[in-house]
From Swiss-Prot:
This is Aspartyl/glutamyl-tRNA(Asn/Gln) amidotransferase subunit B. It catalyses: L-glutamyl-tRNA(Gln) + L-glutamine + ATP + H2O = L-glutaminyl-tRNA(Gln) + L-glutamate + ADP + phosphate + H(+); L-aspartyl-tRNA(Asn) + L-glutamine + ATP + H2O = L-asparaginyl-tRNA(Asn) + L-glutamate + ADP + phosphate + 2 H(+). Pfam families: GatB_N, GatB_Yqey. Transmembrane segments: none annotated. It comes from the Bacteria. NCBIfam families: gatB, PRK05477.1-2, PRK05477.1-4. Allows the formation of correctly charged Asn-tRNA(Asn) or Gln-tRNA(Gln) through the transamidation of misacylated Asp-tRNA(Asn) or Glu-tRNA(Gln) in organisms which lack either or both of asparaginyl-tRNA or glutaminyl-tRNA synthetases. The reaction takes place in the presence of glutamine and ATP through an activated phospho-Asp-tRNA(Asn) or phospho-Glu-tRNA(Gln). Gene3D superfamilies: 1.10.10.410, GatB domain, N-terminal subdomain. HAMAP family: GatB (MF_00121). Heterotrimer of A, B and C subunits. SMART domains: GatB_Yqey. InterPro entries: Asn/Gln-tRNA_amidoTrfase_suB/E (IPR017959), Asn/Gln-tRNA_Trfase_suB/E_cat (IPR006075), Asn/Gln_amidotransferase (IPR018027), Asn/Gln_tRNA_amidoTrase-B-like (IPR003789), GatB (IPR004413), GatB_C_1 (IPR042114), GatB_Yqey_C_2 (IPR023168), Gln-tRNA_amidoTrfase_suB_CS (IPR017958). It comes from Prochlorococcus marinus (strain MIT 9303). Keywords: ATP-binding, Ligase, Nucleotide-binding, Protein biosynthesis.
Amino acid sequence: MTAATSSANGAWEAVIGLETHVQLGTNSKIFTCASTTFGDDPNTHIDPVVCGLPGTLPVLNQMVLEYAVKAAMALNLNIAEHSKFDRKQYFYPDLPKNYQISQFDEPIAEEGWIEVEVAEKGKDTYLKRIGIERLHMEEDAGKLVHAGSDRLAGSTHSLVDYNRAGVALAEIVSKPDLRTGREAAEYASEIRRIMRYLGVSDGNMQEGSLRCDVNISVRQGADAPFGTKVEIKNMNSFSAIQKACEYEIQRQIKAYEAGEAVVQETRLWDEGKQLTKSMRSKEGSSDYRYFPDPDLGPIEVIASVREGWRTELPELPSAKRHRYAEEFGLSVYDARVLTDEYAMAEYFEAAVAAGAEAKGVANWIQGDIAAYVNANRLSYSTLPFRPEQLAEMVQLIDGGKISGKIAKEILPELLEKGGSAKAIVDQRGLGMISDPAAITTIVEELLAAHPQEVEAFRGGKTKLQGFFVGQLMKKTGGKADPKLANQILSQKLKGG
């Protein structure tokens, strides 16, 4: 899906904005000390405050404020000197109080941006700045489980788990600057990456730690007014975000071209059927009857505290990507892969700091090491094969002490147990044969054992050199220096 989609009636442009709900990784909830542990038995992490029982008062968790401000700083948002909490009124079974504590007209932060690298299919990767309207704090709702349906309508009965109710959220609202499903997915991915680098959220979409709602409309041309906006929910992966946007763009275009109206509504993404379906009409902010929460005072973050938090921010993914390209000469792709996960980036930098060449380290991490880590669901921070041990192995390869083939053979043991590649090589006699005299002797023995192939080579069948290289590697157990072996073999085959 491109930014402008051609049709019989001209070019259509999609206008997309995202509301990203990030669960902040505090041990207790936003206004009470109830636990935030995921996956425990239903309704075991609730208390009178969560349930809104008479006589209870909420108290803001200071760690929530710190995490929200740090997230806002990383998104280049302006931190408000004063902000407040409001009550968002609506009735639904997942809200025990019948209102949600959120922030309406005075959020903690406004007017920011991030830049995302977008790799559209068939196009060069491009950089795009996406505006961010605001970040505000709020409490999460409980979770409904509908028997016999994926929503309330059509279910035989519903169960509610309030363990999630009251968990702290940072809602990040983008400006309508996105134009394709791919841009939307890349934006959401970068938001999660930043939150993980900060350590304020694990961003696990399967557990609901990061949830995105898409607001999308289409218009005929970049100068046309916005069309009717539709909200899409129920996307639990970046791929689903992209596909939902692409489907909805086409659905709206077809509706307009058929003379039908596009209704302002909330729709659900159906992963199985790969389509969006109507859920309910979309409420406006006036429907929620916001008013300041009388139980919570205004929020003021003093300058000294704010700047103290700023000094604790890590180097962010975009800065790392740029530095890796400049400092280490890595490609855009390599820099992107290595910085996708904070622990992977730290592992890479530690190996390079131990003296290994950056490109070699990058190749091993992105290949065999990443495959092992992902297959075994491990973390780079706890991997037995430490960065300095990887650096030693890469240095052995670059120094001609072992071949890449030998490194691959010993790597599984190193990944599982850790240890020194040099010690294993020395103990098992796996070092590369780089003595010209020794290789010359082996080459001469091979040529003497295959006179017909030698004659054929000298008769013009030069591809037979590959046969001799294979025989040489087989005879030496893959330990012959490939460059030197090819050089001597070529010389001897030509009669030298």
